[in-house]
């Protein structure tokens, strides 16, 4: 009876616990404690189909639990019960997709790695197989990041838990960080397996520890850019509840903007930035702008409504420059065509249209910029392309209301990894937070208090330096993966 209970515990509860640990670790200081343990559990059950699904399901369920905060949607015309069903369905739907993806990865593990032989397998062959499986996960996250179905995974979730290891992103990007983390998880699992079978594991432990030290040293090896105060930028964290924003009149926004511009000028700012969606559609200033401004808002184009960052010169009453949001939130901002007859989406403004996929923004009042509007912070590839094209600073504008602090922390993690990857300062500005400045090393220089209206100045550095990752992107990762596939085929064919 007890033995049966233990089997059920190992079969069902342990993989669930592993996924929960991973979800808790994502974008928190608990990473050091929970993520290695979570990945150890993943590897230990990786040949079990159900275990893989459960790990992935609970990882997403916990890490993306903020999706429940969509409820209540009564302000959009949904009934209370409909709102609850929609929110829970979205969360569980995403969790099921996560479970399926890890399940598919597990099939690859079963095909490539015979777990019963790992304690006796040649070290080189074992390393090749584990690296190949880890690369498969990392490349999978990269591919997903090019779709609107991805928010955060293992790669960016390492921050703030281990900033030294995250420093490797300058060379290998977020996808490479996935590879490193999964390899660490397997190393712990291999030590456990050797200990359980009473094999010598001292060399495995010491060699792995040495590699860990080297990786942390390389990740922490950087040449900080000397900070300056040459271009002070004012950030207006508006703290306007999204569920009430439809009631705000243009005159109210104008009055707020006049006040924000006066504060910015009193602090000697050269530029004022406001969060995503600050200005209503067809908004015009009823005064001449006193300062250069990048304001989140909406604009009508011939193809429909766009969410944009709108550029104002001194003296402008309407925007003279813009960059449109390209990546739209599924259901929230863009719904499939066949659903248009049922809903305008889970958004106050209804469906909007995507702009150009380029995140490079050049105007004559600053050095070239890389712009990420909300969800676009997940797409490291396009931000990297903007930096490669000459952007000297990243600006990340968002509206994360009404979501909880958990989402704020994940947005911060994403923004910090983008800074590390490209060695660029990152100005973040959000409605209810987070807002502030992140250094090129991924360190937080200034962070406003959340859920309060604030107007303060940050002093970003513009930099023309480019990292290895900025220059080459994921190409080395794909080439190494192909090389590992070749080696795995070679050893499979010519060795026992």
UniProtKB/Swiss-Prot annotation:
From the UniProt record, give one GO term of the biological process aspect: lipoprotein biosynthetic process
- Domain of life of the organism encoding this protein: Bacteria
Question: Pathway involvement?
Answer: Protein modification; lipoprotein biosynthesis (N-acyl transfer)
Per the UniProt entry, the Enzyme Commission number(s) are 2.3.1.269
Q: What class of enzyme is it?
A: transferase
Cite the active-site annotation. 276 (proton acceptor), 325, 374 (nucleophile)
This one is known as Apolipoprotein N-acyltransferase
Q: What is the species listed in this Swiss-Prot or TrEMBL entry?
A: Prochlorococcus marinus subsp. pastoris (strain CCMP1986 / NIES-2087 / MED4)
Q: Which gene encodes it?
A: lnt
């Amino acid at each position: 009876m007890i033995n049966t209970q233990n089997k059920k515990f190992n079969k069902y509860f342990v993989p669930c616990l592993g996924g929960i640990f991973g979800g808790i670790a994502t974008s928190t200081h608990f990473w050091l404690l929970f993520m290695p343990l979570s990945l150890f559990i993943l590897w230990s059950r990786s040949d079990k189909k159900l275990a893989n699904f459960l790990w992935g399901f609970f990882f997403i369920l916990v890490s993306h639990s903020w999706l429940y905060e969509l409820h209540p949607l009564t302000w959009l015309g949904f009934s209370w019960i409909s709102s609850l069903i929609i929110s829970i369905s979205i969360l569980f739907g995403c969790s099921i997709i996560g479970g399926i993806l890890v399940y598919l990865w597990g099939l690859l593990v079963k095909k490539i790695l015979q777990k019963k032989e790992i304690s006796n397998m040649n070290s080189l062959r074992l390393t090749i197989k584990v690296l190949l499986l880890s690369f498969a996960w990392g490349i999978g996250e990269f591919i997903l990041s090019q779709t609107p179905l991805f928010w955060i995974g293992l790669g960016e979730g390492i921050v703030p838990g281990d900033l030294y290891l995250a420093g490797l992103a300058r060379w290998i990007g977020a996808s490479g960080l996935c590879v490193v983390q999964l390899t660490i998880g397997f190393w712990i699992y291999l030590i456990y397996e050797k200990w359980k079978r009473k094999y010598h594991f001292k060399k495995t432990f010491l060699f792995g520890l040495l590699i860990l030290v080297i990786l942390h040293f390389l990740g922490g090896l950087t040449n900080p850019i000397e900070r300056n105060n040459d271009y002070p930028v004012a950030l207006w964290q508006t703290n306007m509840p999204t569920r009430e924003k439809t009631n705000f009149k243009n005159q109210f926004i104008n009055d707020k903007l006049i006040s924000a511009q006066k504060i910015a000028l009193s602090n000697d700012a050269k530029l004022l930035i406001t969060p995503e969606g600050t200005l209503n559609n067809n908004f015009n200033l009823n005064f001449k702008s006193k300062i250069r401004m990048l304001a989140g808002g909406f604009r009508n184009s011939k193809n429909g409504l766009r969410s944009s960052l709108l550029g104002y010169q001194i003296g402008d009453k309407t925007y003279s420059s813009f960059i449109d949001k390209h990546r739209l939130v599924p259901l929230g901002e863009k719904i499939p065509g066949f659903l248009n007859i049922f809903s305008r989406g889970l958004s106050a403004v209804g469906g909007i249209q995507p702009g150009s996929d380029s995140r490079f923004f050049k105007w004559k009042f600053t050095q070239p910029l890389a712009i990420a509007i909300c969800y676009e912070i997940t797409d490291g590839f396009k931000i990297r392309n903007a930096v490669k094209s000459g952007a000297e600073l990243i600006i990340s504008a968002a509206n994360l209301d009404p979501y909880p602090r958990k989402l704020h922390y994940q947005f911060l993690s994403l923004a910090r990894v983008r800074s590390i990857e490209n060695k660029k300062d990152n100005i973040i500005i959000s409605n209810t937070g987070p807002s502030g400045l992140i250094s090129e090393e991924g360190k937080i220089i200034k962070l406003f208090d959340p859920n309060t209206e604030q107007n303060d100045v940050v002093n970003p550095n513009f930099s023309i330096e480019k990292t290895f990752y900025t220059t080459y992107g994921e190409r080395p990762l794909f080439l190494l993966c192909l090389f590992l596939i070749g080696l795995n085929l070679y050893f499979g064919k010519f060795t026992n």
